């Protein structure tokens, strides 16, 4: 909740400057999230930046954060929606791939098409999801679902594959 406030506070001035109605709806209760704060912050900022970039003056950007239950598990739900240009249907299935950009480019852009891929990778690392709902000419809604607690990390299994050179420097396990 504190993190969400820190991130959204930084967009209020932009909203005023651009003439965009920016609404923030957040929980009043804490969520227990085991996250990489920098990565999650970056993902949220990326989505908010895109929302502002593609929304015209007098448009709306909405940030909502709540707790939801899915199949008995608690998730933090972060919804970022806008009344911007929307994403063409032919791009929606590939929008989270690297270097994908659309025709609806803002007037000034230095985009390279990796922002949404970074969001997707961040959510994958946190055992979460990112979903898109978009209507061309009406706007887009991105929903992030981040598992609450830390039980989801028990699912991680890693296999370390080494080379003969690595074995020379390996320390024996107790």
What are these regions (language model features)?
Residues 13, 85-86:
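Glycine-rich G1-box
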Residues 115, 119:
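Short alpha-helical Gxxx[C/S/T] motif in the catalytic ATP-binding
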Residues 87-99:
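Short conserved segment of the HATPase_c
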Residues 100-110:
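Glycine-rich ATP-lid/hinge loop adjacent to the conserved G-boxes
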Residues 123-124:
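Detector for a conserved hydrophobic position within an alpha-helical segment of the HATPase_c
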Residues 16, 21-31, 68:
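Conserved catalytic submotifs in the C-terminal HATPase_c
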Residues 51-52:
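Short helix-loop "hinge" at the ATP-lid/N-box region of the Bergerat-fold HATPase_c
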Residues 127-133:
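Glycine-rich ATP-binding loops of the HATPase_c
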């Amino acid at each position: 909740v504190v993190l969400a406030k820190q991130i959204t506070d930084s967009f209020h001035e932009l909203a005023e400057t651009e003439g965009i109605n920016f609404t923030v709806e957040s929980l009043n209760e804490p969520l227990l999230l085991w996250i990489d704060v920098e990565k999650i912050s970056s993902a949220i900022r990326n989505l908010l930046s895109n929302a502002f970039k593609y929304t015209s003056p007098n448009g709306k950007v909405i940030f909502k954060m709540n707790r939801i239950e899915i199949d008995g598990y608690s998730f933090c739900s972060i919804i970022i929606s806008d009344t911007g240009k929307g994403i063409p249907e032919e791009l929606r299935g590939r929008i989270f791939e690297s270097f994908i950009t659309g025709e609806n480019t803002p007037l000034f852009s230095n985009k390279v098409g990796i922002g949404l891929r970074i969001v997707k990778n961040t959510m994958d690392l946190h055992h979460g999801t990112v979903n898109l709902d978009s209507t061309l000419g009406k706007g887009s809604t991105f929903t992030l679902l981040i598992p609450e607690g830390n039980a989801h990390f028990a699912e991680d299994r890693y296999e370390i594959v080494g080379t003969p050179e690595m074995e020379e420097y390996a320390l024996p396990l107790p």
